[in-house]
Amino acid sequence: MIMTVEEFRSYVDTDKADEVLSAKLAALELLIRKYTHNNFQHRGFRCAADISGSIFSAEALQPFDVGDTIQVTESQLNAGLYTVTAATDTTFEVADTLHDEDDVLVTKVVYPVDVKMGVANMLEWDLNNRSKVGIQSETISRHSVTYFSMDGDNASMGYPKSLTGFLKPYVKARF
C-alpha cells in the first residue's frame, strides 16, 4: 500500500471511514503505477519464493518486514501487490489468500516521500472537491463562487494538473 490510512490521517483531517480511505488509497496507488509506467520496485529486496495459502516460503533469508508492500511477478496465478502481515527468517505472510504456486519472484515496493505527499494531496482534493467537478460557478443572492474548471488541459487523470505534476520525474518511457 502506498500509504496506510493512519499515515494519511496524520496529514489530513477527515471523518471518512477507514475502509473508504483504504479503497481510495489502493485505487490511487494503481492509478499512479499505470500513469507513470513505474513499479517503484527496490530490486535489492527481492527473492524467489513458493506460495502456500497466504504464506510465502523462501529458500534463503527473506528480506521483508511486516508492513512492507511487495509485488509478486513471474506468477501465473498470483501476480499483484500485497502487504506483508507477518514475517520470520525464511517465511512471510500476506493478508490475502492466494493460490498455491512455486517459484514466484517477490520484490519490495518503495514509494518516495514526494509521491506519498502527492497522494495525500490528491486524496484530500478528492474528498473535498470531487463533488464540485462540473460546476463552474454558483451565485446565491449577492454571493458568487467560481470553481476550478476541469476541462481541456487543466486536468490529468481526473485531477487538476497542479496536483499531478509531482509524478513527472517518475514517468518512464513506454514504447
Description of each model-found segment:
Residues 1-117, 130, 153-175:
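Conserved short "hinge" loops at termini or chain/domain junctions
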Residues 123:
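Short Cys/His-centered divalent metal-binding micro-motifs
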Residues 127-134:
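Short helix-capping/linker segments at secondary-structure and domain boundaries
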Residues 136-140:
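Short acidic-hydrophobic surface loop/beta-edge motif
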Residues 142-144:
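Glycine- and small hydrophobic-enriched segments that form the cores of compact globular domains
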Residues 147-149:
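Short capping micro-motif at the N-terminus of alpha-helices
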